[in-house]
């Protein structure tokens, strides 16, 4: 066990989020082995792409070597030479800086025994006509009959392909549709949906039902505004920066066209405090207030992925006298700890049960034990994991030590009071650790662990890793751990005793979006994969009436029949496909209110209120709101 680096980091600007500070203080060759640290860095150009919140003018930055791309509401994306990242910290107009994160679509694979067609809920007098449905996703098969009018012309008003960096309007798309073959059409409009995800989402929200009414989407006569997320780079996952560009494009286009817009976002990630404080979440809240806009976001598929643990350590009170809090997790045992030294390390401790036959340089035992005041969190890392990161979030007012033990029995003791970067090696695993501090928008503290294969190794050590949390002075005692999305880690990598609550993906945690979970329409039951809401009931009860009730409601998300990328139909599952039910329903409400003149103010939070009021109870759910299905149940009752 070696403490390789305990110095203060060179890039510890309090204007930067924690993971950005860690990335800037880590050499490029080391970042390249990390799942997250190099996201946003251009290795060829040696530049960083970052998100900033700012005030005033950024003209001085734009006049130099920094490329400035202004968005909306005081947000911008900057492309900054690595050597000039310190300039941001010195620029008074820059308030806060974050690096991009990867986004993952909320779909699941596998067979489905029974299927559900969106068109089974047809509303004769409401079709979405006069309303824009914006699909920000993997693209769309624009030639599909489901996205055409009765005369064969396209219902797509605009298509912006970020991968091609080209915008196509309805005139260009109609020209392509008039071509003699699909190959010729794709020469005129070369935008394709390689995965079919965006095509399925668009079909559920607003497909025309070319194969029959049962296959129609919810807002079957709406006009479509489509953004294909991505860049020409090799790696396939879109980033939060591309989402922010897309949303800026959509709300500005809706204002330009003077049309209400319902926006569908069927993706997210697990990095963050999950409380609406990240720049992305705040950006969505601001975008939702521009024009006549409704933003619907899927709650993600992390409910059963084993990627989250939350609970409370023993509460000591301000005096530091330890006492077991109600509901506190504990090891339930008392184990002797041995003092281990070597390579300059002192005052670090190892449970007796994990000591036998393990370490050398044991110089004796001390009077110390793993007691019921200690909280044990166990993480299984599967074989062949090339890297994994773990976030530990806690209240900054709470102080406790963290002991991380590897499967071999090696361990490190983390000084959570000393901010900045620390580097360790346990077995064949290198650990980059960053102790964060509160930020201008965040009162919590993050302790970030990035586990990488050590030099000469291809994988991190597999087996059970253990976190021991020992309270020093705790007021609330609340803690929460997050792993990366289940999409990018081994199915065997998960917490031993996971907590399914608070598994919403970001940005569905934004306050002013409509957060959509999934239920199984055949069995009329909550879908266990669906991201759940808040762990502590007081988080609902003690804050403003309903802004922290998440998800807002659920919609069908299992075995949904939707258009595929090749022109046929097939079943899809996930909150990705529950979300467009609500997006389509929002479009219908705005048609009734705004287009038909019944309520010109029916957009934004008012649409959310109407949808909540119209939601129906779900079988087996007796108390509302709850963490599984949100405020009032499901939007589509069979």
Task: Label the predicted regions.
Residues 475-486:
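Edge beta-strands of jelly-roll/beta-sandwich modules across compartments, strongly enriched
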